[in-house]
């Protein structure tokens, strides 16, 4: 008779216990709540940061200046950025804006920043962007300047989103080139900025901006804004949204967070650092604990004792 090795046995045990627990909770086969780093469905997202969205909307509409959202990893910067990007690129008011997303900046140069910006803007029919660019950085910058004039003529404001500034900040030369390009872009425009910089990064990146490019830092009308942390209410809602997704049901206000009890949710909040990523991870550990408890025939409910004993 074949004897499974220790890890294969563990895989088999976990698979069986999770399947039994998921079936008991009414989950769709193959859907495990809280396991995905990226949200598998936008409906899972908890509505937070309304005040910051209002502020960003104000600065964009009035072309008041540039914005930086600075927070620790896992705080929800990616979701916040995607929320704004989706609205400005596909939403009902998308014809009022152009938006360019600059990613993977760890080895970027000033010229590459310009060309990526132009590549992003080439999709807009109102703008005449050349198919090829000059080799010299200053000449590419002149092309960007010409496009900025077209933006103003078309009464369009371009939002330039730059994510994970900390990746470039590790190398001083790279970061200096990125910041020089961003300041150059941010200064374009006759009656106001043609490009609104929308920067995302960690506190370490923000410190490096202050150190290396104070003139750019001073142009941030909303500097180093942070995102809201999750308390009990937000965590309870997150749990309910994930459970609704796992059951392929529509989330509505008041959707129950069972089998998570209130003491369990408080324990999750206490164990997390309040960021969406940390809260989700603690919710997953609690779910895993619930599956282990159920396998021991100790009940379906996830309590604070469940977490203490099995997580």
Which role fits each region the language model picked out?
Residues 1-65, 308-309:
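A short, basic N-terminal segment
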Residues 2-16, 80, 244-311:
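C-terminal alpha-helical "lid" subdomain
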Residues 63-83:
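Walker A/P-loop nucleotide-binding motif
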Residues 90-107:
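Conserved catalytic segments around the Walker B and adjacent sensor/switch elements
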Residues 107-131:
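Conserved NTP-binding/hydrolysis module of P-loop NTPases
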Residues 122-151:
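Central P-loop NTPase core of STAND/AAA+ ATPases
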Residues 156-158, 167-172, 176-264:
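The catalytic "switch" region of P-loop NTPases
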Residues 163-165:
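Walker B catalytic acidic pair
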């Amino acid at each position: 008779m074949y004897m499974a090795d220790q890890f294969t046995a563990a895989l088999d045990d976990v698979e069986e216990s999770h399947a039994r627990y998921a079936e008991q909770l009414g989950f769709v086969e193959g859907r495990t709540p809280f396991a995905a780093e990226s949200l598998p469905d936008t409906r899972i997202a908890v509505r937070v940061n309304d005040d910051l969205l209002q502020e960003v909307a104000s600065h964009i509409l009035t072309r008041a200046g540039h914005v930086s959202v600075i927070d620790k990893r896992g705080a929800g910067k990616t979701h916040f950025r995607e929320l704004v990007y989706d609205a400005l690129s596909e939403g009902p008011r998308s014809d009022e804006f152009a938006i360019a997303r600059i990613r993977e900046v760890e080895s970027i140069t000033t010229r590459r920043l310009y060309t990526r910006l132009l590549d992003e803007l080439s999709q807009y029919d109102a703008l005449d962007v050349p198919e090829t660019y000059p080799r010299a950085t200053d000449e590419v910058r002149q092309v960007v300047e010409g496009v900025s004039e077209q933006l103003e003529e078309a009464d369009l404001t371009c939002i330039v989103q730059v994510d994970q500034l900390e990746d470039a900040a590790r190398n001083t030369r790279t970061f200096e080139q990125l910041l020089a390009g961003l300041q150059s872009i941010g200064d374009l425009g006759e009656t106001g900025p043609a490009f609104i910089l929308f920067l995302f990064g960690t506190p370490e990146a923000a410190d490096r901006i202050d150190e290396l490019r104070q003139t750019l830092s001073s142009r941030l009308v909303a500097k180093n804004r942070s995102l809201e942390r999750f308390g009990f209410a937000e965590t309870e809602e997150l749990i309910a949204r994930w459970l609704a997704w796992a059951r392929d049901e529509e989330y509505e206000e008041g959707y129950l967070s069972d089998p998570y009890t209130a003491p369990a949710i408080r324990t999750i909040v206490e164990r997390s650092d309040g960021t969406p990523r940390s809260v989700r991870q603690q919710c997953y550990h609690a779910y895993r604990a619930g599956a282990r408890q159920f396998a021991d025939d100790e009940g379906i409910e996830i309590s604070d004792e469940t977490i203490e004993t099995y997580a």
